[in-house]
Amino acid sequence: MNKLVKVWQIGRLSYRKSLELQKHLVRLHHENKELSNTLVCLEHPPVYTTGIRTGQYPEQVAKNLEQLGAEFYRTNRGGLITFHGPGQLVVYPILNLKDFKPSMRWYVCHIEKTVIRLCNKLGIEAGTSPNTGVWVKDNKICAIGVHGSRFVTSHGLALNCSTDLTWFEHIVPCGIEGKGVTSLSKELNRHVDVEEVVPLFLDSFSEIFGCHYVDFPKKECDNILADLIQ
């Protein structure tokens, strides 16, 4: 438990700004800044995002989704299309895997284990499938799509807490036919907000990844966000 990860709880942030923030934090790693391992925890306004395989999402598809009141972004993460929005805990781990284990497969597996442990803490039986992510039976509760650059990770996971699941009706989530989506609130039949889930996620991440965490220094947070807003 000697590895240290800084936790940055932002609240609501646009997807565009989150991309800029991730690039900044990745750059800190590549500049060999100390103590750069960071978990960014936030929620997004409604947005559909695709991964590196974007051929099946022509511009008309993007326009149709935007007409629903959501943004649309193409990204360099793995995976196909998914939705982010209010009531969903999005976590972007910006980690140097050389501080853990330099393997993207190991990393994705441990992200899945983290979310499964979180679900277990709430009394939900969750697991994996041949498809990436965390599932409750045939319904995906957490999407995972990551990117690695010289073993520095970006993008991450999206866990449905109290998400409006009707947003997913307009897409084939993660490109997987015949499967559904669910949320912590739906499975527990009560409202489960992001604020309740964050501490459970952090504890589960600490246990699975063998690290401990501290809050990201507020002054450093303010300085970075000020640069992004300009």
What is the predicted function of each stretch?
Residues 97-99, 148-150, 161-163, 188:
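Non-catalytic surface loops within mature trypsin-like serine protease
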Residues 166-230:
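C-terminal accessory segment of soluble enzyme catalytic cores
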Residues 56-60, 141-161:
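Short, conserved beta-strand/beta-arch hydrophobic-aromatic motifs that form part
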Residues 1-135, 140-141, 166, 191-192, ...:
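N-terminal lobe of the biotin/lipoate ligase/transferase fold
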Residues 91-93, 132, 144-146, 157-161, ...:
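A structural signal for short, well-ordered beta-strand segments
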